[in-house]
Amino acid sequence: MIIMEEIKIYCENNGMHYSFPMGTDLKTISDKVCPSVVCKGSENETDVLAALVDNQLKELSFKAMSTHSIRFIGYDHPDGRRTYIRSLCFVLQNVIREIYPDKVLVIDYSLPSGLYCEIREKETMQDGKPKVYFATDDEIEKIQSRMREMIESDLPFKKTKQTLEDTVKYFESNGQKEKVNLARSLGRLT
């Protein structure tokens, strides 16, 4: 008989203590003890997007291996909002890569109510500046529709580790020159 070691979890959202098998991920814990969080200043609820585990931000795939104090967070929390926006960026990146395999999405900088993004050709103009692709209204609608489909399919995000060399090769093959330059600036490439 195999005995699973139990760990203690304190959920700050409801002030309750729980026991879970060691290695249980935060999504499973959230589903059982705190499936949604109440927004501050209102009674509206939002999905759990991440968690503060002993006051450190963790994604929902994080596996709890020891006793922790956990606070599940949603969109109303600054870290929850950043998690949500970053997730949308990954979805948009995948959709652009799918619809325009010969182009690159560049998420350039933050604006007060969003992010400034450009779809660029992989090749630069003669003066070295990036050549921007301007999507039509129909193309934007197609991008939005595909993003919705991808989100509704509820595919998980999978984090992988790669060597710096493999990462640079990947960025080079996708025409992401800024990321290649950033990686090279770390000085760890031969």
Residue ranges of model-derived segments:
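Short hydrophobic/aromatic beta-strand micro-patches
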Residues: E118-R120
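Ubiquitin-like/PB1-type beta-grasp interaction modules and other compact soluble beta-rich domains
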Residues: M1-C89, N94-I96, Y100-P112, K122, ...
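Non-catalytic interaction/regulatory segments
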Residues: L111, E123-T190
